[in-house]
Amino acid sequence: MSGLLLLGLLFFPLVEIIKSVKEPEMLTEIKRRYEIIRTSLPADARWERICSKCAIITGMDPSSGVVGSNVNKGYEIYICLDGEDIDSAMYVFLHELAHMTVSEYDHSTNFWNNFKDLRIVCQNIGVYSPVGTKKYCGKEVKD
């Protein structure tokens, strides 16, 4: 059997396997809402990085012990995917997006103010509903 034919026989089943693997629905929904956020944020210097940069968004298993993380100010954002609580997941996602609005890497007063304002804007555009106080991926989230 020629090498090319063998490669073809291996390649096509692999393509079918890849096509059958689906992204978790919650991650798909977060990405859909992210695109709405990027195209709907008002003109404001704080939101410039969010609107101009398209982050790679990856889901994490709840057993990782991490609720969310942001690599290099939005190059990659990791979000814990736990159940079907989309608003708690969005709270965590907006927290990670808020890190893109400040130059510092810690949770400064400026960060918290921007995070609060971002949640309000996202509530107004219909991609976020306040969560109150609850557990998500083993951590407390609190609006």
Regions found by a protein language model. Give the residues of each.
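Active-site recognition of the HExxH zinc-binding catalytic motif
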Residues: 91-103
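Metalloprotease/metallohydrolase-associated module, dominated by Zn2+-dependent proteases
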Residues: 1-88, 104-143
